[in-house]
């Protein structure tokens, strides 16, 4: 178990966006969550209005990462560049993890996947506002963040159905499942984000050596997720103490809005991280 609060600044402005001058504030409207209210969870089994590619190479990333991807060609075809999305925050909520990690790892393209419409809109606006704030700063400003948040985006998606539509085999380096819906009732367990069937898909898009992070404040859910990950042949447990100095794990524990709420309530956080194993070698035929 990983427990104990960490310091975090809740704030109402975009965090960790830089402080702006009074003139810049007039130019920039920072989104506020109270205008993006929606239910805490969504039914993943109903058909939502979702756009997703038939296969990863057909995904147009130019609207998400305009600094890294060119727009589709005149004939509608897409030219894939060398950069790929490598980190995915599944059920990213209001984007706290993404905004914390983006300036720490400006060379990594990271994507939040969120099924709720209003929450996705909030994160989209939050990223746009933060990018604009960065563009208003002088190049030599101490508040300028590496990458200017051009490496982060969000998409409305049902990760339980469409992960392989967005990501090729072995494309992802890190996948985060932070404070997911616990689905307490037994009949609802099939809707949990970690199941044997779903782990097969996560193992497909996660490269060997990649890490899957889980954090929750619900002990039963922690034990459920850890049990299924331990049982899967393509994942191996990483002792949490070996990641004690990992800024990514610290952000996973403390940067999300849910994580900060748990800290304010002095609750426990349960952490389990697993590494993707190498694919088993095929035995030579006699």
From Swiss-Prot:
Subcellular location field: Nucleus
Keyword tRNA processing: yes
Coiled-coil region list: none
Binding site for S-adenosyl-L-methionine: 91, 114-115, 158-159, 178, 256-258
Reactions listed under catalytic activity: guanosine(46) in tRNA + S-adenosyl-L-methionine = N(7)-methylguanosine(46) in tRNA + S-adenosyl-L-homocysteine
Assigned EC number: 2.1.1.33
Active-site residue numbers: 181
Pathway: tRNA modification; N(7)-methylguanine-tRNA biosynthesis
Keywords, alphabetical: Methyltransferase, Nucleus, RNA-binding, S-adenosyl-L-methionine, Transferase, tRNA processing, tRNA-binding
The UniProt record lists the keyword Ribosomal protein: no
GO molecular function: tRNA (guanine(46)-N7)-methyltransferase activity; tRNA binding
InterPro entries: SAM-dependent_MTases_sf, Trm8_euk, tRNA_(Gua-N-7)_MeTrfase_Trmb
Extent of the signal sequence: none
Cellular component per GO, a single term: tRNA (m7G46) methyltransferase complex
Family listed: Belongs to the class I-like SAM-binding methyltransferase superfamily. TrmB family.
Task performed by this protein: Catalyzes the formation of N(7)-methylguanine at position 46 (m7G46) in tRNA.
SUBUNIT field: Forms a complex with TRM82.
NCBIfam families in UniProt: tRNA (guanosine(46)-N7)-methyltransferase TrmB
The protein's name in its UniProt record: tRNA (guanine-N(7)-)-methyltransferase
Organism, scientific name: Cryptococcus neoformans var. neoformans serotype D (strain B-3501A) (Filobasidiella neoformans)
